[in-house]
């Protein structure tokens, strides 16, 4: 736990933190275990926590009028996940977050989020950078979804996130990329044939 979280903080802020700073940061989080298919936040309900994955995987999604899940974000070990809209506004969530595998997470509530940011400027900087990176990633994904074909989107996704390809169900990856599962299957076969 300690190494994964500490590495995440240091990589994000681009500098080392002291043991005292790490202990201070860690004191605001609590450890929780989750089963597979646990709903962490549900659309329409207030999302009260930010989650840091130590073990396992999770994803966020919207459900359309036909009951189809549209994946928005994936998280494996070393990733943070939340419904930013609900967590920061206090309003009902706009999507659902569910575990894909059983695992453990460090959990941070809104009150402790404010305390952690107020306690040290490095921690406020850390979360600012995380939120900026989430926003940048979302803008980039929207631009690519609207300007590139499915083959390019999958190739880039598989190059950037090879661990996701191994652990996330293909139908969810297809949903994330905005394509049908059958199309993803065809693309994967074509790309495998080129290797």
Please name every model-derived segment.
Residues 14-17, 104, 144-147:
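Localized chelating/binding microdomains
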Residues 93, 112-149, 153:
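A small-molecule sensor/coupling module
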Residues 32, 51, 73, 98, ...:
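Residues that recognize and position ribonucleotide moieties
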Residues 39-99:
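Cyclic nucleotide-binding regulatory domains
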Residues 148-195:
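Phosphate-/nucleic-acid-contacting segments
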Residues 1-30, 86:
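Cyclic nucleotide-binding regulatory module and flanking cytosolic helices
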Residues 61, 83-84, 115-116, 157, ...:
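Residues that scaffold the ATP/ADP-binding catalytic core of kinase and kinase-like folds
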């Amino acid at each position: 736990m300690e190494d994964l979280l500490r590495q995440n903080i240091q990589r994000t802020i681009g500098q080392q933190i002291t043991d005292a700073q790490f202990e201070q940061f860690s004191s605001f989080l609590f450890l929780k275990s989750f089963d597979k298919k646990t709903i962490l936040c549900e659309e329409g309900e207030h999302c009260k926590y930010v989650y840091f994955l130590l073990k396992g995987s999770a994803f966020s999604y919207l459900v359309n009028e036909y009951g189809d899940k549209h994946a928005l974000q994936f998280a494996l070990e070393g990733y943070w996940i939340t419904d930013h809209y609900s967590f920061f506004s206090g309003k009902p969530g706009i999507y659902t977050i569910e575990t894909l595998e059983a695992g453990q997470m460090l959990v941070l509530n809104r009150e402790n989020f404010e305390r952690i940011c107020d306690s040290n400027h490095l921690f406020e900087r850390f979360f600012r950078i995380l939120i900026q990176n989430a926003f940048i990633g979302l803008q980039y994904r929207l631009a690519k979804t609207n300007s590139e074909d499915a083959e390019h989107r999958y190739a880039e996704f598989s190059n950037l996130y090879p661990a996701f390809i191994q652990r996330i169900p293909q139908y969810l990856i297809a949903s994330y990329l905005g394509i049908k599962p059958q199309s993803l299957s065809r693309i994967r076969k074509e790309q495998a044939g080129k290797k």
